[in-house]
Amino acid sequence: MKKIISKRNIVFITAATVAGVATSLFTGYTERDNFNMPYSQIPFCAVSPKLPGEITFAGEKILLTAQDRRERLDREILAFTYSHINTLLQLKRANRLFPIVEPILKECGIPDDFKYLMIIESNGDIYAKSTVGACGLWQFMDNTARSYGLEVGKHVDERYHIEKATRAACAYLKESYDEFGDWLTVAATYNAGRAGISKRIEKQKEQKAIDLQLVPETSRYIFRLLAAKTIFSNPVNFGFTIKNRDLYPPLPIAKTLTISTDVPCWADIAKKHGLTFMQLREANPWIRETEMPNKTGKRYEVLIPDSAGLHYNPEETVAHNACWVVK
């Protein structure tokens, strides 16, 4: 016999189902699932982090009481705070990269805070490549890279060479400081170019880029840099609970190999040292192909990781900056 459900019953069933879903969404689970996952009776809550009244960048105190400054910083702080994956990866990668980059900045006379410029340029991704072709941690375009002495080609691309690209970035930043005399303005030139910033300073009769009306990308860039420093100075204040074991340790480099001949197969060199080609390239991201012709006899310094050291105990990882982690 065919059963017919009345409209009244359909309405009742639908209402009960909706009520059940709503209860599930807003009160959380009342029982643990089969995987014994923890549960919460409190729904997700987004909060707006407290902003500082001032920030010191490259030794200069920057007041944030003005409406435009405060609200521009607020936007970037929120972007970092709620872009959980990117910000966590930036912090994890920084533990590996900052010990390499910081001494170079110091040696070249560039303020330590410019390591955060590297972070906002590439998220600390050694293989980063933008849609317009800027590459590496410091996001050099090919012609700019060549003008600062970096080799850019099919087999070798030194925009991905951490030390050399950092030195090239320092050279650019130093030249910009010689012209503008203000480090935050120098940072703006890294995004918009010296000519563009100089023209706007002249037309708007200001002295510093932070007070300029700029295209949205560059305007945000300045405050993204300040936000990066703010977040990295105390991640836990912005909801990032990280332990030592979560950070990426520096690569264990066993030795440096000098090569001035053709390399028919990088994998052969890797295997000779107990490595995979991928592991060799992780330490030398400037290697772009599985082989390297070298007609000029140029000398290349190749970092050889300790194959045993690549297998590590996360619990033994040491934080480069103690303020990044919680006990």
Residue ranges of predicted features:
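Short conserved micro-motifs at the rims of enzyme active sites and ligand-binding pockets
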Residues: 236-237, 269, 313-317
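Extracellular LysM carbohydrate-binding repeats and other cell-envelope/extracellular binding modules
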Residues: 279-325
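Short alpha-helical segments in extracytoplasmic peptidoglycan/chitin-binding modules
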Residues: 190, 266-271, 279-281
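Catalytic glycan-binding domains that act on GlcNAc-containing polysaccharides
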Residues: 65-248, 288-293
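Primarily a LysM-type cell-wall glycan-binding module
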Residues: 244-274, 298, 326-327
